[in-house]
From Swiss-Prot:
Single GO term (MF): RNA strand annealing activity
Compositionally biased residues, Basic residues: 137-146
Ranges annotated as biased composition (Basic and acidic residues): 117-136, 147-177
GO BP: any one term: post-transcriptional regulation of gene expression
UniProt GO cellular component terms: cytosol
Disulfide bonds listed in the record: none
Gene, per the UniProt record: proQ
Region annotated Disordered, chain positions: 105-182
Protein name: RNA chaperone ProQ
Keywords: Chaperone, Cytoplasm, RNA-binding
Amino acid sequence: MENQPKLNSSKEVIAFLAERFPHCFSAEGEARPLKIGIFQDLVDRVAGEMNLSKTQLRSALRLYTSSWRYLYGVKPGTTRVDLDGNPCGELDEQHVEHARKQLEEAKARVQAQRAEQQAKKREAAAAAGEKEDAPRRERKPRPTTPRRKEGAERKPRAQKPVEKAPKTVKAPREEQHTPVSDISALTVGQALKVKAGQNAMDATVLEITKDGVRVQLNSGMSLIVRAEHLVF
């Protein structure tokens, strides 16, 4: 037992479970819904194997059941399976709806992250373009003026025309936003904005959760947002 290799990550544990219980777990493709209480079955069946601890098993199960491919497999009429692939009852409507919401929130988070990354790339490209478009101006050599001979009359200096100062164009005022410092002070139905890079999208508070605030965008999409991305 002491010479068994140790699995260091949840992905390695999932790969081991897919090999150990191929009729229950899968390493790729759509996953089958698991039996309720399967954690205890795993503890009983793989206790001591690969130096696995309960904490590792619990973390691997959490990662497996929150993956997109597992959530895609939670559909009405689908049957749960045990470690040997035996049917253990159909999914109820509550579990199907919960999985659907989790999948929508995960997609919304990815979309928001991509939008923020694209905004940063556009800002960096714009800053680089401004530097390239403004090369240093070369100084022209000053023309040499012949020295005035002694006794020669001085010519009156031509007066320079008075140049009018160019009118300063006022830059448009940037919209100022106040960050949300305490999400507990928010109320359901309250209007606020969600920051995505340099932009702020209008949203409405749907629910205040322990992970953040669930909001609905004007597009109809709902997602959970952390306090640092919320402003008034």
